[in-house]
């Protein structure tokens, strides 16, 4: 079928709408959900992933269930959460499913925005990549790795542990996201507060370059403006290497892996279509589409998984519940790194 996606930008969001035709029932899917989704005929997906990545997933969903018309609203982090909260206060919630990373979406878990759904595919996801109650699961995971410029750092210089980055040779040559709270909070949990704070203070003494956004940092690294990024998403490294940038990743223990949480709105206008989306996104078929976007899957039966590049190092799933202490974590991070308020 020839599709002509429409891109709009209401309220600062990118919107992708695709139109489709009629379905073949999915094996194992209950008839009630299928019939309900046919009557609903729509799915509205809020997420921060790039439009091409969302289009790939939604187009595949529509080929499987062509009785659905999907609409994609794109915004990231706090902007996405703010949009959802604003809609709720106004009584005009229009979203069915949301996907986001970081502590911001966990606030929605705490505030009761999500519906329980015991998706059959959840059983393929290990502990730490789903909650026990059935409100959310990890649609993808983003391992956080050290990244270096291969023109500026020789293999013999590579750090063997995080504290090696505090050696004099790296002074003025390091970069880090100025709001990397999820990474810090999880290091703090694993290492203990004293060790984690000592590490941040050491980075500050190294005159580390603090910049908002990992994509921008990856560009600075590729251009040689810094030699090493203390923390970066693995998918950013893979994408930069594909474009010919002289970058490589280094997995130091522990690798914190951020969760790309996916959940259904408890007031979803199209709840059955939302369940179809969750079933598809968590399935082997859906996860194999996810890994083609350079994001990682925690399913063991997915091929071409970027997560498989990380070997012999502990990969710790991010504990989203640490977001309960968001203010304290943010203030510590700013204080010990010297981030401007």
Describe each model-derived feature in a short phrase.
Residues 147-152, 188-190, 258-270, 289-290:
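A bilobed periplasmic-binding-protein/Venus flytrap-type ligand-binding module shared by bacterial periplasmic
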Residues 10-21:
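Bacterial N-terminal signal peptides
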Residues 103-107, 227-246:
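A ligand-binding cleft/hinge motif common to bilobed small-molecule-binding domains
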